[in-house]
């Protein structure tokens, strides 16, 4: 097993210097830290977790609370991608992840906070939960460092997608493609939905596009059946939309199924757009027009900022980080000549 002494000998520095470099002390230059860390990795050094825990009074374990209303779990493409980048960034700083749940030893039920304390989590990442639930509030308001994803809660650390700008970019693109009859099937009530819906109406007003009430419908996120039923209603209108925006890419697949069952072609007969930019959307034929969320940076920033707060609680900033998405034009929004818009 490689020791600090072995690394010190290779780097021609003291054991104390190696220890400081590996523990990110401020009194060593970044250049020297980098050199020592690279050498340690090259030599296959792995710190003794028990010794490190005793020394730092930390478990090097971060809890993840993820309980979306539809119970999708890790089949939730968007949050699975966010979690993956969070995991990579956390592991790069030697932290493990454990899911927060209500199960305890001997089958005894625990609250989220009780489970977090039982596991000794250094911090918690909270994503896709209902903040009106008492147990969620209890955990979020505790003294355990917390970062929330896509939700701003009190003075807690938060990393959020710019949903308002994302919807503005998506709507504007559809408008520039000649569409004026634009419908929106939005998700159920949440901070994300509120931001997107406000931006949808705001962008329409700015561009002079009238949105009839019957053009706006609601379904659950990732609900292909609900999205399909809403699509049926929109297509049955006396003056149907020329483009439908779905709450997310997965829900859009439900709309695609209904449209094709009617013998209609996308985008020749009806244009559609999704939201999220999941990998599967780029495999459809034609490729789905969508707003790609930057899951890589959402997860990475959340992990890095949470760990900074864990390790440097007196100096780490408890701020809100906004991550921009990017329009993927795809092939499902037809360029209109003006006669159909």
Regions found by a protein language model. Name each.
Residues 42-48, 105-108, 129, 256:
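Short gly/ser/thr-rich secondary-structure transition/capping motifs
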Residues 32, 75-78, 135-138, 193-196, ...:
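Residues at alpha-helix caps and immediate loop-helix transition turns in enzyme cores, especially N-
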Residues 1-60, 339-340:
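N-terminal helix-turn-helix DNA-binding module of bacterial transcription factors
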Residues 42, 85-95, 141-148, 152-341:
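Bacterial carbohydrate/catabolite-sensing allosteric modules
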Residues 2, 57, 61-172, 176, ...:
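Alpha-helical recognition/docking segments in bacterial nutrient-uptake
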Residues 20, 101, 127-128, 219, ...:
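Small/polar loops that bind or transfer phosphate-bearing groups
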């Amino acid at each position: 097993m490689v020791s600090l002494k072995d690394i010190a000998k290779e780097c021609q520095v003291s054991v104390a210097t190696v220890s400081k470099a590996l523990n990110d002390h401020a009194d060593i230059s970044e250049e020297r830290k980098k050199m020592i860390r690279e050498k340690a990795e090259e030599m296959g050094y792995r710190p003794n977790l028990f010794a490190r825990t005793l020394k730092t009074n930390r478990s090097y374990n971060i809890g993840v609370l993820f309980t979306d209303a539809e119970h999708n779990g890790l089949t939730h493409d968007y949050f699975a991608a966010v979690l993956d980048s969070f995991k990579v960034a956390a592991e790069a700083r030697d932290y493990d992840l454990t899911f927060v749940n209500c199960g305890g030893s001997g089958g005894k039920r625990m609250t989220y906070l009780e489970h977090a304390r039982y596991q000794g989590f250094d911090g918690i990442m909270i994503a896709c939960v209902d903040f009106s639930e008492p147990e969620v509030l209890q955990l979020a308001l505790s003294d355990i460092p917390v970062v929330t994803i896509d939700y701003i809660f009190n003075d807690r650390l938060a990393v959020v997608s710019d949903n308002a700008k994302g919807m503005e970019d998506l709507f504007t693109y559809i408008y520039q493609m000649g569409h004026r009859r634009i419908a929106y099937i939005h998700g159920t009530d949440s901070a994300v939905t509120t931001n997107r819906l406000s931006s949808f109406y705001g962008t329409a007003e700015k561009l002079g596009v009238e949105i009839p009430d019957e053009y706006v419908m609601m379904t659950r996120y990732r609900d292909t059946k609900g999205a399909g039923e809403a699509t049926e209603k929109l297509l049955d209108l006396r003056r149907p939309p020329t483009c439908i925006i779905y709450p997310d890419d997965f829900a859009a697949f439900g709309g695609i199924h209904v449209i094709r069952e009617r013998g209609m072609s996308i985008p020749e007969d009806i244009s559609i757009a999704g939201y999220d930019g999941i990998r599967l959307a780029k495999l459809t034929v034609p490729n789905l027009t969508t707003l790609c969320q930057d899951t890589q940076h959402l997860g990475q920033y959340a992990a890095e900022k949470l760990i900074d707060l864990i390790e440097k609680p007196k100096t780490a900033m408890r701020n809100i980080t906004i991550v921009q998405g990017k329009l993927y034009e795809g092939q499902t929004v037809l360029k209109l000549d003006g006669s159909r818009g």
